[in-house]
């Protein structure tokens, strides 16, 4: 019997999951790695530690499932997007730490480019707003701040990659330097209409083309793992950025279907079909996947701090010992007690895009408790997701959401899911398998290798666990949203000089 191995390289941990033909999990392993904060609003990872942790969990997942490497039909890779690595082509050694998607150090560069009117060109070609969230300005920063980097880049001695590319390079032992369209569409460098690296964009960001990876479909054979790693050459047959893999894993394969992933951040995507809609409401248009010689586009809204707000209550304020305790604590309060929490720890994402916003807890009185603050934190995740979907309704012609498919760690929180259904006034549907990110990468790999035969087969494997129906009175919902909007306005533009970023 054969299996699919999914590599799921996330923001805080590296994971590996083994799936069988019915999408059942046969083995799983996970390892957290170091978060590096050199100064406020800077976030880095050690690429060598990422690779080491990923290699370790692959071996562990196979051992846990008692599956031999030669029983793996194919490997799929999914990854934290935008996070940027640059390494030496000859040695494979990174020239700087990976700059993580959450990192805000290049906000000033983005401000300057916006003053020059470059944001409009970038939006039309990439579907992205000009923000430090994306890879482009991170590459520029490394080339300009690491001694000798620019010269080496001009000489073709360096490789750039998002995390998928870095893992692929190491899995094939320097044989393959490539990425897929979904990850490339988050760099600020890919023209999402021509599906090519764009010379004008490279010129704007002063990035040499020589460092860029080859572009490929998301569901295709990239290469094979080097025999020295696992004792077998395993085909690497699928790659997609985490949110796009989750969209595929949720079987949102038809135009108009939507999913929200409640992870470190929240990422709401709507399948918009085969034609890009360039959005002027500050939502993002990206390529979700490429297969069978065409690409599928999504409209996405990104919330920077989703489940991470619960981690902060756990680790920063020590409100509880386990994240799973947040639900029972929040449920001990019948409502938020007038407390609103805007977790703008690293600024605000869609639809506000304010790098200068900061976190705020407002409405506190002597009667406010840990339970009220925890409930407000959970509610903030749903409020931010509501803001995105509300903006999407204005942006997509004739778009009416009937159900929202959900996944990610915080989707297990029933209080949060019910509140989300109440705000959106639509069904929130949680599937039986919530490991949809890893599953999406597995599906893409398995379709390329012939393990699964068709998209229809993928759709048939998707099963419902629980449906949350809206039940909140409309006037109560409207009052909550009114207060949330007041709280959001208080958090905006808090940082008054860019040195504090």
UniProtKB/Swiss-Prot annotation:
It catalyses: glycerol + ATP = sn-glycerol 3-phosphate + ADP + H(+). GO terms for biological process: glycerol catabolic process; glycerol metabolic process; glycerol-3-phosphate metabolic process. Its EC number is 2.7.1.30. It comes from the Bacteria. Sn-glycerol 3-phosphate binds at residues 11, 81-82, 133, 242. Signal peptide: none annotated. Pathway: Polyol metabolism; glycerol degradation via glycerol kinase pathway; sn-glycerol 3-phosphate from glycerol: step 1/1. GO terms for molecular function: ATP binding; glycerol kinase activity. ATP binds at residues 11-13, 264, 307, 311, 409. GO terms for cellular component: cytosol. Keywords: ATP-binding, Glycerol metabolism, Kinase, Nucleotide-binding, Transferase. PROSITE patterns: FGGY_KINASES_1, FGGY_KINASES_2. ADP binds at residues 11, 15, 264, 307, 409, 413. InterPro entries: ATPase_NBD, Carb_kinase_FGGY, Carb_kinase_FGGY_CS, FGGY_C, FGGY_N, Glycerol_kin. Glycerol binds at residues 81-82, 133, 242-243. It is an enzyme of class 2 (transferase). Inhibited by fructose 1,6-bisphosphate (FBP). Belongs to the FGGY kinase family. Key enzyme in the regulation of glycerol uptake and metabolism. Catalyzes the phosphorylation of glycerol to yield sn-glycerol 3-phosphate. This is Glycerol kinase. The lineage of its organism: Bacteria, Pseudomonadati, Spirochaetota, Spirochaetia, Spirochaetales. The gene is glpK.
């Amino acid at each position: 019997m054969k299996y699919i191995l999914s590599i799921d390289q996330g923001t805080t941990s590296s994971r590996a999951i083994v799936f069988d033909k019915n999408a059942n999990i046969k083995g799983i392993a996970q390892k957290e790695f170091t978060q590096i904060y050199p100064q406020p609003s800077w976030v880095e990872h050690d690429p060598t530690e990422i690779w080491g942790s990923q290699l370790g969990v692959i071996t562990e997942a196979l051992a846990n499932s008692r599956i031999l490497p030669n029983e793996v039909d194919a490997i799929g890779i999914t990854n934290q997007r935008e996070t940027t690595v640059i390494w030496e082509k000859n040695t494979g050694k990174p020239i700087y730490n990976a700059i993580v998607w959450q990192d805000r150090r290049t906000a000033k560069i983005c401000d300057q480019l916006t003053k020059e009117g470059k944001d409009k060109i970038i939006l039309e070609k990439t579907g992205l707003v000009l923000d430090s969230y994306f890879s482009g300005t991170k590459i520029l920063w490394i080339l300009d701040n690491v001694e000798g980097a620019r010269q080496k880049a001009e000489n073709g001695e360096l490789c750039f990659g998002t995390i998928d590319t870095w893992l692929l390079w190491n899995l094939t032992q320097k044989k393959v330097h490539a990425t897929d369209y979904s990850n490339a569409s988050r760099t600020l460098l890919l023209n999402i209409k021509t599906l090519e690296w764009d010379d004008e964009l490279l010129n704007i960001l002063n990035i040499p083309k020589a460092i860029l990876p080859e572009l490929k479909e998301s569901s295709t054979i990239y290469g094979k793992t080097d025999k020295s790693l696992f004792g077998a050459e395993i085909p690497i047959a699928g790659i997609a950025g985490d949110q796009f893999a989750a969209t595929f894993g949720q079987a949102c394969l038809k135009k108009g279907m939507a999913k929200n992933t409640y992870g470190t951040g929240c990422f709401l995507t709507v399948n918009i079909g085969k034609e890009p809609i360039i959005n002027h409401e500050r939502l993002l248009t990206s390529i979700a996947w490429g297969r069978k010689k065409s690409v599928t586009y999504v409209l996405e809204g990104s919330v920077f701090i989703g489940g991470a707000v619960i981690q902060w209550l756990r680790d920063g304020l020590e409100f509880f010992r386990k994240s799973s305790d947040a639900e029972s604590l929040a449920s001990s309060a019948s409502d938020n007690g007038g407390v609103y929490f805007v977790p703008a720890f690293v600024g605000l994402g869609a639809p506000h895009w304010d790098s200068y916003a900061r976190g705020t807890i407002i409405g506190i009185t002597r009667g406010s408790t840990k339970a009220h603050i925890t409930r407000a934190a959970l509610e903030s995740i749903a409020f931010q997701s509501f803001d995105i979907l509300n903006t999407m309704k204005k942006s997509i012609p004739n778009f009416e959401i009937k159900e929202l498919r959900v996944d990610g760690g915080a989707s297990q929180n029933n209080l949060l899911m019910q509140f989300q259904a109440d705000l959106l006034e639509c069904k929130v549907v949680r599937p039986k398998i919530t490991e949809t990110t890893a599953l999406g990468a597995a599906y893409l790999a398995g379709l390329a290798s012939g393990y699964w035969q068709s998209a229809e087969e993928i759709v048939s494997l998707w099963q419902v666990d629980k449906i949350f129906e809206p039940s909140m009175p409309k006037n109560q919902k409207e009052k909550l949203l009114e207060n949330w909007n007041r709280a959001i306005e208080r958090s905006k533009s808090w940082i008054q000089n860019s040195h504090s970023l």
